[in-house]
């Protein structure tokens, strides 16, 4: 065993193997360009633009903010205890958005649902149901992925739209069930 180890060590450390290994390593090292570090330009507080404005180069982006105003419309939550009265017994069609706090696409579509709730005020009610807190209702209606938007009318599930879809897709679904 010791002689086999010595033989393999002798083969690995032969001058010919070392010379060819160091030559190929040197070739590989020369192929990598030297690092110049990471460069960045900090945003000025009074500027709405990132990056070099004159150059109009890559990575420039616009940063928008509304100061002192919350422009989003909060969609009320429905729970297991309020489901019957708010959704099943509603006189108007109801759009229910199934969501979870950890779901990125749910956060993307939430402002769209808020906007639609304002546009269809008096014709449609909009609620959201947290599937983590109310798994019974989600499984009762076959929700397998979120976000899922369901439309209920007269206590019956009428339509479902799955995913963070464009506003026009939700409008097309809503228009089938609202009074004109």
Swiss-Prot record:
Coiled coil: none annotated. Residues 1-64 form a transit peptide. The record marks 104-105 as: Contributes to redox potential value. Keywords: Chloroplast, Disulfide bond, Electron transport, Plastid, Redox-active center, Transit peptide, Transport. Its main location: plastid. Gene3D superfamilies: Glutaredoxin. The keyword Transit peptide applies. The active site is at 103 (nucleophile), 106 (nucleophile). It is found in: Plastid, Chloroplast. It comes from the Eukaryota. InterPro entries: Thioredoxin, Thioredoxin-like_sf, Thioredoxin_CS, Thioredoxin_domain. One of its GO terms (molecular function) is protein-disulfide reductase activity. SUPFAM superfamilies: Thioredoxin-like. Probable thiol-disulfide oxidoreductase that may be involved in the redox regulation of chloroplastic enzymes. This is Thioredoxin M2, chloroplastic. It comes from Oryza sativa subsp. japonica (Rice).
